[in-house]
């Protein structure tokens, strides 16, 4: 067995600097490992804090104002701005909660009601309505990008008939999973009846 020679000692001027860098690196690594952002379970509560209505409306209106290519034909649609609806946000929150409780993404709630039935039950009168759902996306940007990549979801986002929106997500407990793995998203779009 061949023995490796001992490493040459570092020049004395560089040794303290290297020790300080190694110590700093170890402290930084320890601090990051202990920080809430480094732990997946701490990264989960996006739904409770990151969905400010202004940010949601701004993000979706930015897309609607420049148009999106929703079909293979390449036709770009431009649509009027949306406004936040607390009523639609409540419907979206109820659906996200139902999906989390059922541990299943879908357009029907625990009582097997579709969107129109849920809107009516919440007292929202409408002339047009649409819903997008998703699971597993860690941020608003990620889920909107995914919806824009899907023809039918993009059609809903760019639908010129809808004027209002509500969006919600619900974090279900997914032990040891990715931060967004159990995050259920619901976007409800609607338009009040025409007068």
What are these regions (language model features)?
Residues 54-62, 86, 90-97, 117, ...:
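Solvent-exposed, polar/charged alpha-helical surfaces in well-ordered, non-transmembrane soluble domains
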């Amino acid at each position: 067995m061949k023995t490796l020679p001992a490493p040459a000692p570092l020049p004395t001027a560089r040794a303290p600097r290297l020790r300080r860098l190694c110590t700093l690196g170890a402290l930084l690594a320890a601090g990051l490992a202990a920080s809430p952002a480094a732990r997946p379970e701490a990264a989960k509560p996006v739904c409770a804090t990151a969905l400010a209505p202004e940010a949601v409306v701004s993000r979706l209106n930015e897309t609607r104002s420049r148009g999106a290519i929703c079909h293979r034909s390449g036709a770009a649609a431009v649509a009027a701005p949306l406004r936040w609806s607390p009523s639609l946000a409540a419907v979206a929150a109820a659906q996200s909660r139902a999906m989390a409780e059922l541990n299943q993404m879908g357009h029907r709630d625990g009582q097997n009601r579709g969107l129109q039935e849920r809107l009516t039950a919440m007292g929202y009168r409408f002339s047009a309505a649409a819903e997008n759902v998703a699971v597993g996306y860690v941020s608003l940007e990620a889920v909107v990008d995914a919806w824009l990549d899907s023809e039918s979801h993009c059609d809903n986002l760019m639908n010129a008939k809808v004027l209002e929106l509500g969006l919600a997500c619900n974090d279900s407990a997914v032990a040891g999973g990715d931060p967004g793995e159990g995050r259920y998203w619901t976007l409800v779009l609607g338009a009040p009846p025409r007068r």
